[in-house]
Amino acid sequence: MLVCIPDVLSRHEVAEFRHVMDAADWEDGRSTAGAQSAMVKRNEQLPPDGELARALGRRIIQALTANPKFVSAAVPLQIFPPLFNRYAAAGNHHFGIHVDNAVRGDPLTGLRIRTDLSVTLFLSEPDEYDGGELVIEDTYGSHEIKLPAGDCVLYPSTSLHMVTPVTRGARVASFFWLQSMIRDAHARSMIYDLDGAIQALVERLGRDDPETVKLTGIYHNLIRYWAEV
């Protein structure tokens, strides 16, 4: 399941992020890659243990956990501290085809998560750079993702994916992973679809409609059945 979520950050918030990020010191992005990924990764990152990355990351997590669409799609249990990268044309930056590590550990907090879902939050407008598409492969083919600044995409961490070479400008983004309460991707997808159907019925019939209440109960009972907390 691939889900795009608009307006996670406002234009003003994106401008605040970029103001401090553009003035920051960046390092080689291979420092956070696994052995195989490091062979095909060429980009820059904010130091992941730096106060700037941590502070901006906390703001992103706060925005996402208040976003109903994100919570519905992810059913998050643990969210890894967001990281930040930059792909610049001047550095011939790109990230070849790879799959994310199954488990991620944060050395500062000791947090370890199973990576069920990957998230990319775009912090550059599409017209600021050429190339730099996030290409995600699944059973239905390849999907090229290039979203407005402030929007994010949520996709299974099991997916092969890549970032195409940036040929003009710079692509700035945040990226991270999460562990869902619902391990099984098919179950999680059904929960997301069911929640969407319930919300549509609420709009038409109201929260007190008996059938809406019954479906809401089924939703919570399925969460109870599948959740690992």
From Swiss-Prot:
Q: Where does Fe cation bind?
A: 98, 100, 161
Q: Which residues form the Fe2OG dioxygenase domain?
A: 78-180
Q: Which InterPro entries match?
A: Oxoglu/Fe-dep_dioxygenase_dom, PKHD_C, PKHD_hydroxylase, Pro_4_hyd_alph, Pro_4_hyd_alph_FE2OG_OXY
The cofactor named in the record is: Fe(2+); L-ascorbate
Note on cofactor: Binds 1 Fe(2+) ion per subunit.
Q: Keywords in UniProt for this one? A: Dioxygenase, Iron, Metal-binding, Oxidoreductase, Vitamin C
Record-annotated disulphide pairs: none
The UniProt entry's GO biological process terms, in alphabetical order, are:
DNA damage response; intracellular iron ion homeostasis
Q: Which Gene3D superfamilies match?
A: q2cbj1_9rhob like domain, Rabenosyn, Rab binding domain
GO function terms (MF aspect): 2-oxoglutarate-dependent dioxygenase activity; iron ion binding; L-ascorbic acid binding
The residues the record assigns to binding 2-oxoglutarate are 171
Protein name as annotated = PKHD-type hydroxylase RPB_2089
